[in-house]
C-alpha cells in the first residue's frame, strides 16, 4: 500500500494550486482532530511565472517594482511558508507534499532532510552531486566552492500539528533569467542553476517527474 496519493496538476496558476493543497491540508488537519483516517497527498505541478515570498522574507529581495512584475506577466504572492523569495515557472517541478509527519514518526527537521535527500538521489541519476549548504535549506551544487555555489532546488514548508504544506521547487528546464528579478532565497552571493543548464541540453520533463515520484515512494515508504 502506498503511503501517499499522487496528483499531477500539470501547468497551473499558483493560486489554483494553492487551493488544492490548502484543501488537502485542512482535510488532513481535521482528520487528526477527529480521529478519522485520510490519505497523505503529493502534488506535482508546473506553474505559470510567479514569485512567492515566505513569512521570513524581505521585500527588499524583490529587485523591481511590483507594477513592473505585473507588466511582465509575473504574479507575486506573500505566503505562509518558511524561507524568503523564490521564482516558480514553466520547466520547474514544483512539489507540494501534504503529509502527516506522524505517519513516519518524523519531526520537521527530519522531514526537510528527507526532502533534500529525495532531490539528491534524483540528481545522482544524472551524475550530478547535489549537496546541502550549512545554515540553509534546499539542494546545491558546489556549495562550498567560492563563486561556484548554485542552488538547483529550493525548499520552503509550513507545518501545523505535524501536517505539512508547501514544499520544493526543482529546476529542470527553467528559464533562469527570472531569478535576476530577485535575490533568490535572500542570497546575494550565490547562483541558481537547472538540470538543463548543468547538462547542456533540455531534459525530458515528464521522465524527470516520473523519476522523482519513484524516489519519493522509496524514501517516504
Swiss-Prot record:
Region forming the signal peptide: none
Sites where the protein binds substrate: 81-88, 154-156, 167-169
The BPL/LPL catalytic domain, residue ranges: 36-221
Active site, UniProt feature: 185 (acyl-thioester intermediate)
Enzyme class: transferase
EC code: 2.3.1.181
UniProt cross-references to InterPro entries, sorted A to Z: aa-tRNA-synth_II/BPL/LPL, BPL_LPL_catalytic, Octanoyltransferase, Octanoyltransferase_CS
Cross-referenced Pfam families: LplA-B_cat (PF21948)
UniProt pathway annotation: Protein modification; protein lipoylation via endogenous pathway; protein N(6)-(lipoyl)lysine from octanoyl-[acyl-carrier-protein]: step 1/2
GO BP field: protein modification process
HAMAP family in UniProt: LipB (MF_00013)
UniProt miscellaneous comment: In the reaction, the free carboxyl group of octanoic acid is attached via an amide linkage to the epsilon-amino group of a specific lysine residue of lipoyl domains of lipoate-dependent enzymes.
Protein task: Catalyzes the transfer of endogenously produced octanoic acid from octanoyl-acyl-carrier-protein onto the lipoyl domains of lipoate-dependent enzymes. Lipoyl-ACP can also act as a substrate although octanoyl-ACP is likely to be the physiological substrate.
Protein name: Octanoyltransferase
Protein encoded by which gene: lipB
Amino acid at each position: 500500500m502506498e503511503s501517499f496519493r499522487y496528483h499531477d496538476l500539470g501547468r497551473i496558476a499558483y493560486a489554483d494550486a494553492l487551493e488544492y493543497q490548502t484543501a488537502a491540508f485542512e482535510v488532513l488537519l481535521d482528520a487528526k482532530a477527529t480521529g478519522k483516517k485520510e490519505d497523505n497527498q503529493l502534488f506535482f505541478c508546473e506553474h505559470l511565472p510567479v514569485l512567492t515570498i515566505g513569512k521570513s522574507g524581505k521585500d527588499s529581495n524583490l529587485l523591481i517594482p511590483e507594477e513592473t512584475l505585473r507588466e511582465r506577466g509575473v504574479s507575486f504572492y506573500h505566503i505562509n511558508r518558511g524561507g524568503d523569495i523564490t521564482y516558480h515557472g514553466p520547466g520547474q517541478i514544483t512539489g507540494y507534499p501534504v503529509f502527516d509527519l506522524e505517519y513516519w514518526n518524523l519531526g520537521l527537521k527530519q522531514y526537510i532532510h528527507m526532502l533534500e535527500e529525495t532531490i539528491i538521489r534524483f540528481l545522482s541519476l544524472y551524475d550530478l552531486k547535489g549537496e546541502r549548504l550549512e545554515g540553509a535549506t534546499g539542494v546545491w551544487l558546489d556549495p562550498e566552492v567560492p563563486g561556484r555555489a548554485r542552488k538547483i532546488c529550493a525548499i520552503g514548508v509550513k507545518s501545523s500539528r505535524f501536517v505539512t504544506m508547501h514544499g520544493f521547487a526543482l529546476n529542470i528546464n527553467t528559464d533562469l533569467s527570472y531569478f535576476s528579478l530577485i535575490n533568490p532565497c535572500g542570497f546575494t552571493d550565490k547562483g541558481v542553476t537547472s538540470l538543463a543548464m548543468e547538462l547542456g541540453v533540455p531534459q525530458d520533463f515528464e521522465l524527470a517527474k516520473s523519476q522523482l515520484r519513484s524516489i519519493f515512494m522509496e524514501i517516504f515508504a
